[in-house]
UniProtKB/Swiss-Prot annotation:
The gene is rhaA. Its main location: cytoplasm. The keyword Isomerase applies. Mn(2+) binds at residues 262, 294, 296. InterPro entries: L-rhamnose_isomerase (IPR050337), Rhamnose_isomerase (IPR009308), Xyl_isomerase-like_sf (IPR036237). It is an enzyme of class 5 (isomerase). It comes from the Bacteria. GO terms for biological process: L-lyxose metabolic process; rhamnose catabolic process. Pathway: Carbohydrate degradation; L-rhamnose degradation; glycerone phosphate from L-rhamnose: step 1/3. This is L-rhamnose isomerase.
Amino acid sequence: MTTQLEQAWELAKQRFAAVGIDVEEALRQLDRLPVSMHCWQGDDVSGFENPEGSLTGGIQATGNYPGKARNASELRADLEQAMRLIPGPKRLNLHAIYLESDTPVSRDQIKPEHFKNWVEWAKANQLGLDFNPSCFSHPLSADGFTLSHADDSIRQFWIDHCKASRRVSAYFGEQLGTPSVMNIWIPDGMKDITVDRLAPRQRLLAALDEVISEKLNPAHHIDAVESKLFGIGAESYTVGSNEFYLGYATSRQTALCLDAGHFHPTEVISDKISAAMLYVPQLLLHVSRPVRWDSDHVVLLDDETQAIASEIVRHDLFDRVHIGLDFFDASINRIAAWVIGTRNMKKALLRALLEPTAELRKLEAAGDYTARLALLEEQKSLPWQAVWEMYCQRHDTPAGSEWLESVRAYEKEILSRRG
């Protein structure tokens, strides 16, 4: 520990103590908040089922930065490199298309054995795993419908895929001792004016009920459902809208997923957390950065990321909110993208933990909105960075931008050889 870091740390403790904040307690609380990193940033959502296939489902990864992972071994190595540069607890979020098999496996036939390497790797790295069925980039999703498909056989294929995915998710939780959150997102929708908006939603409702009909141990598996406003090619109608899934999660008591990019550009999910928590047992967050649409840019330490973190901390939702990331930028170094986005999420959580929330509540309850605003703004200038640097030091990770040197070295030694 450098003398400079020690001095900054001691001064920061004093400054925060003056406003009633115990920084050591804040760091202990930060270690209770794992962030689930998404595997698909590492290979532009290609997966291993058909890596040369097209990405469909109304989503898009733009850019052609060299060095993307081409197989599971490379992806795990890249994840390890990124995780070494991110302090504190982490999880990994997998999609079904990241299975490993020597022979082709139909999506409705995936089994835990196809993910055993991921589980062994997670054990070795002390990680929890989360999961997602992959209802896109497949011949049977090519017409834009999956769980709400009008064709019974196609709809059943996707039902069976989701049911198989739940068993994989439960396997993760059983093996790793921490529940796997399995999120269902489907791209179903229509490009232009839709006459019958009801029937697809009726089919989706029945399909989801069949998907979750098998009772699984909640200590191993948690169901979540995710809405979206629109996607490319589904601009006019999305079957799984916000209202549909809020109603579903409320009535079936599943977790609800709120994705930062899946709403109108003027909406923010930070304002939805406290409302949804009144009706659903748990929330899954997909923290992202939409630029004009669901562009999935790398997460910044911006106002909305901070507001999301503050909602979790202010309302003590540590055990009811699962924090995941969802972005994929192929125009920059993919490992750097993971590091930047995940560190920013953790910085936002730390800043929220360093807020004098009790004092702010008193001011708000007393109607002293002048003092509330003044204190909120003044606390932004408190030396939270010194606390962050100590947190990084204790977790043996770089405190500042020196992490980029490690990424550049890895890029030169490993990524540059991938072609």
